[in-house]
C-alpha cells in the first residue's frame, strides 16, 4: 500500500505542475477534476492503512488473564446433630454463611444406605461429609436437602416408616454394643456380680488377684460360721 500511495503522490505532484502551466479553461477543469480524484483516492488509501494498523495493534494485545476461581482445600465435616420423625431421619450440619452460596454449590447424593454432602466455595473452602452404612435403608427418591440460615438440613426418608432408629449408622450401633457389660443384666444379680469379679480377676495383676482371693476366702469362712454379713 505504501507503494501505491507513493505513486498517487507522484501523480498528484505532476497534475499540480500541469495545472500551473495550463491556460485554457477546458484543460484546467480536467486537471482540477483529476487532482480531486487523486486526492480522494489517497485519502481512502491512508484511512485503510490506519485501520489495518489499528487492527494489528489490537490483535497483538495480550489476552486478558482471568483469575481462576479457587475453592481452597476441603474440610471434612465431623460435627453434626440428628433426630427423627416417623418418616424421616434428619441430619443438621452447621456451616456459617452457607445460605449465601449459590444453590448449585450445595450438593447431596443419596444411596439406599449412605449419603454424601459437598458444599463448594464457602468462604474460600469446600466442605465434605460422607456417611456410609446407615442403620437402615432409606428411599433415595424421597430423600432431599434444605438450606437454611447457617445450616444444611439433610432429610433421609425412611424406607420403613414408623420405625425407630437407635443409631444413625451400623458402625455406631456396633461400637455402642461393644461398650455394654459382658454379663446379661436379666440374669440373677449375684451371678452378674460374680462375672464382674471374675473379669476383674482375669485382667488384674498379682496384687489384685491376691486381694480378691483373700476376700473370697474370708467370705467363705464367714458363711461357714453362719455369718451372712457378706
UniProtKB/Swiss-Prot annotation:
Region Interaction with SKP1, residue ranges:
75-230
- Domain CS, by residue range, is 75-169
| Gene3D superfamilies reported for this sequence | 2.60.40.790, UVR domain (4.10.860.10)
From the UniProt entry, list the residue stretches annotated as the region Interaction with S100A6.
Answer: 156-230
Q: Which residues carry this modification: N6-acetyllysine?
A: 10, 21, 87, 120
Its GO biological process annotations read: heart development
UniProt PTM: Phosphorylated on serine residues. Phosphorylated upon induction by RA or at high calcium concentrations.
Residue intervals passing through the bilayer: none
Chain ranges of the SGS domain:
170-230
Record carries keyword Transferase? no
Q: GO molecular function, one example?
A: ubiquitin protein ligase binding
Chain positions covered by the region annotation Disordered = 38-59
Q: Which Pfam families match?
A: CS, SGS, Siah-Interact_N
Q: Which residues carry this modification: Phosphoserine?
A: 3, 36
Q: What ranges does the record give for the region Interaction with SIAH1, renumbered to this chain?
A: 1-82
Where does this chain mainly localize? Answer: nucleus
Q: Which UniProt keywords apply?
A: Acetylation, Cytoplasm, Nucleus, Phosphoprotein, Ubl conjugation pathway
InterPro entries listed in its UniProt record:
CacyBP_N (IPR037201), Calcyclin-binding_UBL-bridge (IPR052289), CS_CacyBP (IPR037893), CS_dom (IPR007052), HSP20-like_chaperone (IPR008978), SGS_dom (IPR007699), Siah-Interact_N (IPR015120)
SUPFAM superfamilies in alphabetical order = Calcyclin-binding protein-like (SSF140106), HSP20-like chaperones (SSF49764)
On assembly, the entry states:
Monomer or homodimer. Component of some large E3 complex at least composed of UBE2D1, SIAH1, CACYBP/SIP, SKP1, APC and TBL1X. Interacts directly with SIAH1, SIAH2 and SKP1. Interacts with proteins of the S100 family S100A1, S100A6, S100B, S100P and S100A12 in a calcium-dependent manner.
Q: What does this protein do?
A: May be involved in calcium-dependent ubiquitination and subsequent proteasomal degradation of target proteins. Probably serves as a molecular bridge in ubiquitin E3 complexes. Participates in the ubiquitin-mediated degradation of beta-catenin (CTNNB1).
The identity of this protein, by name, is Calcyclin-binding protein
Name of encoding gene: CACYBP
